[in-house]
Curated annotation (Swiss-Prot):
Intermediate chain of the cytoplasmic dynein complex 2, a multisubunit complex, composed at least of eleven different proteins. The cytoplasmic dynein 2 complex consists of two catalytic heavy chains (HCs) and a number of non-catalytic subunits presented by intermediate chains (ICs), light intermediate chains (LICs) and light chains (LCs). It is found in: Cell projection, Cilium; Cytoplasm, Cytoskeleton, Microtubule organizing center, Centrosome. This is Cytoplasmic dynein 2 intermediate chain 1. The keyword Zinc does not apply. Residues 473-552 are annotated as: Binding to the DYNLT2B-DYNLT1/DYNLT3 dimer. SUPFAM superfamilies: WD40 repeat-like.
Length: 1066
């Protein structure tokens, strides 16, 4: 190729001319048929523009002149100077013709548009004819022998190598063509960079670079038309090529050669006609192209771009073939079998580009071993690909290139034209060589190929004698596409998959030998024998001395419905199931409660031992009949300046004491100054109260629940009954932070104040007493709606409240199943979140039975206290201010005696201040009166068994209580702060001990004790003083420990006292 000369579409065969020529050869054998076809082609060519008539009138001697020029090229080695001058002259003449041709094109461009519509219809007919011609040519090419094709291949390749050498030498001699040499160097650099192998041929990289360049410079509007025409005709050509490829195998080689000489006549005419048609059709399809540009151009343009980048590369590879003929022949057999089907994919001017692409596919496979020796022979064909792509932008650049040629000297123009003619001759020889190679291997490969669908099996068509293996190209493209998809998928997966190196471990952990092993290794075998005394002798590792613990995963079910209440991975028979031991939950709770109490007491003793001043102050207050004493911590901020009004104990929890404190004399805490305070103490923990209760009304009396001391009942001066539930969460009540800590002040859970006005008390309450189910009798005459078990559990029982007017109300204590934090609408006295309330059960009027007929002078009798018989809670006794004790029942049954009277006859204004039943089940009780007399009554007798009138020196008795540890001992308190101890077995005439409590006056007294204690019984007196302090006096053992058979001895004493009384009354 001449330096500086850009290769155009005029330098190659046009696909339309080639198809028509092949059709003439294949369909007609006689001269008449050929003449008829030539006339038809002449008529079609006459319709073209005038500038194309000259190449249409080429005579058959043109092929001979082409061969002469090739021969001149071969002889150029001997005389390069003379041949160069002649070539330059020829090139000048050809340039003059080309300029005239360009001028005629500009003049008749408007005339082309008028004829384009009729040509489109003729072009469609020509395409159909070409389809048949190509399919018939496939069979004709199979007739060529393999030996003839190989021989011609080698000869034409050698001639082409010599002509290429001549052209290369001419290019190097011309200084004006430095631009072409620069392109050649760039092409070699790309080849060295990308390489040329079977997996990645050079045409792939050229296609890739060309695609990037084309994205930067958008195509002309007619490119989409070419893609649509190509894709629409592809399937039809593949179908016909497959059906008729085997039907023309009887044609001879001579007919093919004759047709090859006639191919050049119609080449230029059809190329110009296709250009005109393409321009006209692009103008019509311009709107439609814009809509489908983003879709069809991406899908269909990829294959056309991929195939259009390697036509010139095939020519260079053939020119540099000459080192190993056998290897080249081997590549020719492998790649020359299937190259026919892709010609019809490009209409018009692009079909010539596809011819060059097919040549590239054939020659790339043959030149893998010779790319290293062919580096200097390559040119930069990127610009050539632009020209040969059939785009209209190249036609606009042709005048510029021709103007540059006109500026060159005449000698250089001639030389360029001569090189161009040599290249045309080379193209013809390459076509003949490719046809021969295809005919040798085409039939065998065609028979081996499976006849599948048109989308999978490649169709073949002849393209100027140059063949491309599109089957392998398609396979490579699919492989590359699949590899690209796999690479993209692997890249995405690698982003998601991340190895975690946060955990490391050692595969080999070889710690150093410890001292013991080193000692045994050195000295253990000397006169010793190593023996193991533990099990698992084979394991000698450190810290391993016993067998491994067996573990098993199980699931559990609570409560268990059967003996099998758990399961795991192992399957066992139900007979092997171990019977779950039955746990006594109440016993466990009792043990835990006692254990907690013991621990708390021990901690309290340790605290007291650490404070010797506290112990010394308590020992100073010890009485002579007590072994030791202690003091409750009443110096708390909320208890300062408050006097103790009364003390109460629990018969169930003997160590529990309740103290009632009046209003403070001085203001200290504004929140508590207007409220009465009740403290629940444990005598073994004197550092502070267990619970602190507050009440707005004055508390006149109180008591604890009979069986479980978790409820506290109190009577007020306003006549209401108040209940505190000691189990409630402290978050429901007031909490105050004082100087010594954080304290919770509990308000009443339930109060009868303001509700139940029809049955509520209208006078101050004098006593509140619990009514529990008898533990000494199996049956009770009380008609209770609750079962015995429920009543014994402490969750439901009765209490009685007595006011000074003689009204006795009986209440049922009810515990709700669920607390309502929002409060109750029906129970207005219930605190929000509370669960315990009182329900009125019965009302007993005692005023009528206590009134004395004929003694109106004394007025209404006032009731002071009430007690229920422990052995039979149906019976109760009530003390009055007339010295009489009333006896009654809750069922309004007649009882005898109705009144308990003193030994003196007549009615006296003496108050019965205190009444107490014996805690040991005997039907006897003590009564202390305001005149200082103490009476011992039996429930079946109206008069006392024993009565002591001057035992307290006529001082009023304010406190009286049986000893909880000894049946024959009781304690008495008078209003002069004296304490008396009575022991009936020792003396029934008076007290056996007396103690004056001074200087701090005694206000209240209560006795606590536990006779069943394992370490021995203890008896303690809780003394409340006027200053507000509370002392605990632990009495000596002689008063606390019971004597032998003390209950029987007491009965004998009472019987002896009863006989004289009976005789006296008789």
């Amino acid at each position: 190729m001449e330096p500086g000369k850009r290769r155009t579409k005029d330098d190659t065969w046009k696909a339309d001319d080639l198809r028509k020529h092949l059709w003439a050869i294949q369909s007609g054998g006689s001269k008449e048929e050929r003449k008829h076809r030539e006339k038809k082609l002449r008529k079609e060519s006459e319709m073209d523009l005038p500038e194309h008539k000259e190449p249409r009138c080429r005579d058959p001697d043109q092929d001979a002149r082409s061969r002469d020029r090739v021969a001149e090229v071969h002889t150029a080695k001997e005389s390069p100077r003379g041949e160069r001058d002649r070539d330059r002259q020829r090139e000048r003449r050809r340039d003059a013709k080309d300029r005239e041709k360009e001028k005629l094109k500009e003049k008749h461009r408007e005339a082309e548009k008028s004829h384009s519509r009729g040509k489109d219809r003729e072009k469609e007919k020509d395409r159909r004819a070409r389809k048949e011609e190509l399919r018939q040519t496939v069979a004709h090419h199979n007739l060529l022998g393999q030996e003839t094709r190989d021989r011609q291949l080698l000869e034409r390749a050698e001639r082409k190598g010599r002509s290429v050498s001549k052209v290369r030498s001419e290019e190097k001699d011309e200084d004006s063509e430095r631009g072409d040499e620069d392109r050649e160097r760039r092409y070699r650099e790309r080849k060295l960079q990308y390489g040329d192998s079977k997996d990645n041929p050079l045409k792939y990289w050229l296609y890739k670079e060309e695609g990037e360049r084309r994205h930067r410079k958008p195509r002309e509007p007619d490119r989409d038309n070419k893609h649509r025409e190509k894709s629409s005709t592809r399937e039809k050509r593949e179908k016909y090529s497959k059906e008729k490829s085997n039907s023309f195998s009887d044609k001879g080689e001579e007919r093919h050669k004759e047709k090859r000489h006639k191919e050049g006549f119609h080449f230029d005419d059809e190329r110009h006609q296709s250009n005109v048609d393409r321009k006209e059709k692009s103008a019509k399809d311009e709107p439609r192209k814009r809509e489908s540009q983003n879709g069809e151009h991406r899908n269909r343009g990829a294959s056309s771009k991929r195939d259009g980048t390697s036509s010139q590369h095939a020519e260079n590879l053939v020119r540099n073939h000459g080192k190993d003929k056998d290897s080249r022949r081997k590549h020719g057999h492998e790649e020359g079998s299937s190259v026919w089907w892709k010609l019809d994919q490009r209409p018009g001017g692009e079909e010539t580009v596809e011819i060059e692409k097919e040549e590239t596919d054939l020659e790339n496979a043959r030149a893998d071993a010779y790319t290293a020796s062919c580096e200097d022979d390559f040119e930069d064909y990127e610009d050539d690909f632009e020209v040969c792509d059939g785009d209209d932008d190249e036609s606009s650049n042709e005048p510029e290139s021709r103007e540059k040629l006109e500026e060159l000297p005449l000698a250089q123009k001639k030389e360029i034209q001569e090189i161009q003619r040599a290249i045309n001759a080379e193209n013809e020889r390459i076509g003949e060589l490719s046809l021969k190679l295809f005919q040798k291997r085409g039939r065998t490969e065609f028979e081996k190929e499976p006849r599948t669908d048109t989308n999978s099996s490649p169709s073949r068509a002849s393209v100027c004698g140059i063949f491309v293996d599109f089957a392998s190209a398609s396979h490579r493209q699919k492989s590359r596409t699949q590899a690209l998809k796999q690479k993209m998928r692997s890249t995405k997966l690698l982003r998601l998959i991340d190895l975690d190196f946060s955990f490391t471990f050692s595969l080999l952990d070889l710690p150093p030998v410890n001292e013991y092993d080193m000692y045994i290794r050195n000295f253990g075998k000397k006169n010793t024998k190593q023996a193991y005394v533990q099990c698992n002798e084979d394991n000698v590792e450190r810290d391993i001395q016993t067998e491994e613990i067996e573990t098993r995963e199980v699931w559990t079910q609570h409560p268990g419905e059967s003996t099998v209440v758990s399961g795991g991975s192992e399957q066992r028979d139900t007979s092997d199931a171990v019977v779950m031991p039955k746990i006594d939950t109440p016993r466990l709770c009792s043990f835990l409660r006692a254990a907690c109490q013991v621990m708390a007491v021990l901690l309290e003793e340790d605290r007291l031992a650490a404070e010797p001043s506290w112990n010394l102050r308590a020992q100073d207050r010890a009485l002579y009949f007590s072994d030791s004493s202690s003091q409750l911590n009443t110096s708390l901020p909320f208890l300062q300046n408050r006097k103790v009004s009364s003390l109460h104990t629990s018969r169930v929890q003997r160590q529990m004491v309740v103290s009632v404190h009046d209003l403070p004399e001085k203001s200290f805490v504004p929140l508590l100054d207007s409220k009465y305070v009740l403290c629940v103490w444990d005598i073994w923990q004197p550092s502070g109260p267990q619970k602190v209760l507050i009440c707005e009304s004055q508390v006149t009396c109180c008591c604890l629940s009979p069986l479980k001391a978790f409820l506290l009942f109190a009577g007020t001066a306003h006549g209401s009954v108040v209940v505190w539930d000691l189990r409630e969460d402290s978050r429901l009540h007031y909490s105050v932070t004082l100087s010594d800590g954080f304290w919770t002040f509990r308000t009443a859970t339930f109060s009868t104040d303001g509700i139940l006005t029809s049955v509520n008390h209208r006078s101050p309450l004098q006593a509140v007493e619990p009514i529990s189910t008898s533990v000494h009798k199996k049956q009770s005459f009380v008609l209770s709606p609750f079962s015995t078990q429920e009543e014994m559990s402490g969750l439901s029982f009765h209490i009685a409240s007595l006011d000074e007017s003689g009204v006795l109300n009986v209440w049922v204590v009810v515990e709700l199943p669920k607390a309502d934090i929002a409060g109750s609408i029906s129970d207005l006295g219930l605190m929000p979140g509370g669960r315990v309330k009182l329900v009125h059960s019965a009302l007993i009027q005692l005023g009528d039975s206590l009134s004395h007929k004929g003694n109106e002078f004394w007025g209404t009798t006032q009731t002071l206290n009430v007690k229920f018989l422990p052995s039979d809670p149906n019976h109760f006794i009530i003390g009055t201010d007339m010295g009489l004790i009333s006896h009654g029942t809750r069922q309004d049954l007649r009882v005898a005696p109705k009144l308990f009277k003193p030994q003196q006859h007549g009615i006296r204004p003496v108050k019965v201040n205190v009444i107490d039943f014996s805690p040991f089940g005997e039907p006897i009780f003590l009564a202390g009166c305001s005149d200082g007399s103490i009476r011992l009554h039996q429930l079946s007798s109206a008069f006392p068994l024993l009565q002591w009138d001057s035992s307290t020196d006529s001082h009023a008795v304010t406190g009286l209580q049986w000893s909880p540890t000894r049946p024959a001992v009781f304690l008495v308190q008078d209003d002069t702060s004296n304490i008396y101890i009575w022991d009936l077995l020792q003396s029934d005439l008076g007290p056996v001990a007396k103690q004056q409590v001074s200087p701090n006056r005694l206000v209240a007294m209560a006795a606590v004790g536990e006779p069943e204690k394992a370490g021995g019984s203890f008896l303690a007196l809780v003394l409340a003083r006027a200053s507000g302090s509370i002392d605990i006096q632990h009495l000596k053992r002689r008063w606390a420990a019971p004597e032998v058979d003390e209950c029987n001895r007491l009965r004998l004493l009472l019987q002896e006292a009863l006989w004289p009384e009976g005789k006296l009354h008789k």
